[in-house]
Amino acid sequence: MENPIHLLLMAVVQDQDLEAATRSVQSIGATVTYLSSAGGFLGRRNATLLIGLPAEKEKDALEALQKSCRQRIEYLTLPLEGSPMPMPAPVPITVGGATVFALPVERFEQI
């Protein structure tokens, strides 16, 4: 039997989207493993999904992630520069969605 895993997608998603993203990707027949991780900029908890799949299912997996991982507006408080008092100013930032890396798989074994 030929190896069905030819592509590894590494998708970084927000914790809030983890369950929906996992179900969505599993629904197309892909194998999913997740690792807890944290973002560097905001330090928020997120998850890195390791998704193994045949190369021809890459588009389906990306569509599944796009449907289940949504972007959100959150506010980060930063001190006002030049202010005599350190008053925080809320700054809107866009977070969420998914950051996806695609890697070819030369060899895959289940032991």
Give the role of each language-model region.
Residues 1-111:
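Positively charged, small/polar-rich N-terminal and surface patches that mediate targeting and assembly
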